[in-house]
A protein has these predicted regions:
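N-terminal structural segment of carbohydrate-active enzymes
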Residues: 2-124
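Aromatic-lined substrate-binding rim segments of carbohydrate-active enzymes
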Residues: 107, 121-159
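Formylglycine-dependent
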Residues: 3-9, 80, 173-225
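Aromatic- and acidic-residue-enriched segments that line the glycan-binding/catalytic groove
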Residues: 48, 52-68, 125-141, 166-204
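Alpha-helical packing segments of well-folded alpha/beta enzyme cores
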Residues: 38, 98-105, 109-110, 145, ...
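Residue-level detector of conserved catalytic or cofactor/ligand-binding positions
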Residues: 226-238
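The substrate-binding groove and active-site-proximal loops of carbohydrate-active enzymes
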Residues: 13-21, 81-98, 128-144, 202-218, ...
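Structural detector of well-ordered beta-strand residues that form the stable sheet scaffold
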Residues: 161-163
């Protein structure tokens, strides 16, 4: 992906569009019919963290010394400096993943839409991406999870959504820098743990340190996952 060209395209679309980068403007955007009218949807929270099968914040908490996750990790996998969260990726094989069977089950349950987590706070993308090699198409299962589900959802007449939790990656692995672990400086854009900033007690719009322009630009570019739907439908829930 040509990052600069894609950013220019985003700016051009924004300039020509009816919405502006303000809460007042964005609040006028109507809720999509598929989300407003459908009675039941299935939300899927699944990823590399499913390998240790502890919970979805395992990647953060295993780097907090004294936490139950840290103790569990050391007991079962060793010290984080020797076996970090990224080392679970080769074990995320998804041998039994059958998107057709999944969608059939969801449809039989009465669901009309499916919303998987396309990227969790841990930074691993469950879709093919040109922005990072840390994605399911290139590592782990070597499958485009979102793309595979999209094909089957469209075939069944269902809408597929995408939930992106990338913004919290800013600090999600930051505790790993507090002791000798596999998360250490220097880190750069494209590295798995980057930027691993210190976590503050209050995560709000005014928390310091604020995300850098480099991080926010990368976050914006990752919303390009909306294009995996072309020419079909993908509902974006970020």
């Amino acid at each position: 992906m040509n990052r600069e060209r894609y950013l220019q395209e985003i700016d051009a679309v924004n300039a020509a569009g009816k919405y502006h980068p303000t809460w007042e403007s964005l609040s006028t955007h109507p809720v999509p019919d598929w989300y407003r009218e459908k009675r039941l949807g299935i939300f899927l929270h699944w990823g590399v963290f499913s390998v240790p099968a502890y919970h979805d914040w395992y990647a953060r908490n295993m780097y907090i010394k004294g936490s139950p996750e840290y103790e569990y990790h050391c007991q079962h996998y060793g010290q984080p400096k020797d076996f970090g969260f990224k080392d679970f990726i080769p074990q995320f094989k998804m041998e039994a993943f059958d998107p057709q069977a999944w969608v059939k089950l969801f449809r039989e349950a009465g669901a009309d839409y499916i919303v998987p987590v396309a990227e969790h706070h841990d930074g691993f993308q469950n879709y093919r991406s040109e922005l990072s090699h840390w994605n399911a198409a290139e590592m782990g299962p070597h499958r485009d999870i979102m793309g595979d589900l999209l094909v089957e959802a469209e075939r069944a007449g269902m809408t597929l959504g995408a939930s992106s939790h990338r913004v919290e990656h800013w600090w999600f692995l930051g505790h790993g820098q507090e002791f000798d672990s596999d998360i250490k400086q220097p880190m750069h854009l494209g590295d798995y743990a980057w930027p691993a900033m210190p976590e503050r007690e209050n995560q709000d719009l005014f928390s310091e340190p604020m995300p850098t322009d480099e991080f926010l630009t990368d976050w914006l570019l990752r919303l390009s996952l909306i294009h995996i739907s072309e020419p079909t439908r993908l509902g974006m829930i970020s």
